[in-house]
């Protein structure tokens, strides 16, 4: 095993531990000492890889966002019509809400902390740019294939679709019973379908 591989393994162990601790205790209550103990490393080694708890939170959310981007790319690749794309948007959003609530809650923590931390603010800005770019590129390819014909420019449409799904996810976090209401998912599908337009 190379030194680089060993380093990556330690860093991943710390990130997994941070994800568990931050999820269970919240950002404010979780401590570096707890995260280091959970990862089975010293505080000194943790700080060798990550400068602060802020950076740990940001990197945990970044890892989740990378997975989100992969879901979005797959969504666009397998959609053959605007109807498909609207349905798949529901599938992706539902997958995140139901399969990875930790990512949802830690993302909210990250958004809150971004108002106080320049480091986290920079990370959040970069992550949202990554998400918008993925959606914009997918929309551009879908339009090129003739499966959608939106009435608004693709850049603003990408931001709008993300705003709608983010807003719903935030409401589901506050009121979990809403996520069990099928009408919410039907409304998301209908709204997305209307925004995407009819392909040729």
Question: What label would you give each PLM region?
Answer:
Residues 119-125, 129, 143-195, 199-200:
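Hydrophobic/aromatic-rich alpha-helical bundle segments in the mid-to-C-terminal region
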Residues 84-85, 98-122:
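Amphipathic alpha-helical segments used for helix-helix packing
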Residues 10-18, 35, 60-64, 68, ...:
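Generic hydrophobic, amphipathic alpha-helix propensity
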Residues 1-9, 200:
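N-terminal intrinsically disordered/low-complexity leader segments
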Residues 13, 20-55, 59:
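Helix-turn-helix
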């Amino acid at each position: 095993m190379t030194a680089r591989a060993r380093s990556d393994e330690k860093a991943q162990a710390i990130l997994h531990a941070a994800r568990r601790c931050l999820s269970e205790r919240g950002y404010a209550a979780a401590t570096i000492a707890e995260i280091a103990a959970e990862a089975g490393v010293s505080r000194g080694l943790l700080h060798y890889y990550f400068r602060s708890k802020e950076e740990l939170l940001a990197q945990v959310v970044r890892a989740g966002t990378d997975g989100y981007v992969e879901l979005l790319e797959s969504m666009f690749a397998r959609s053959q019509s605007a109807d498909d794309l609207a349905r798949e948007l529901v599938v992706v959003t539902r997958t995140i809400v139901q399969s990875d609530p930790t990512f949802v809650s830690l993302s909210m923590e990250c958004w809150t902390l971004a108002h106080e931390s320049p480091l986290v603010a920079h990370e959040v800005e970069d992550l949202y740019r990554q998400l918008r770019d993925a959606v914009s590129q997918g929309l551009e390819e879908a339009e090129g294939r003739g499966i959608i014909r939106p009435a608004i420019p693709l850049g603003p449409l990408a931001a709008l679709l993300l705003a709608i799904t983010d807003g719903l996810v935030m409401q589901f976090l506050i009121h979990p019973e809403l996520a069990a209401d099928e009408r919410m998912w039907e409304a998301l599908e209908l709204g997305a379908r209307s925004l995407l337009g009819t392909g040729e």
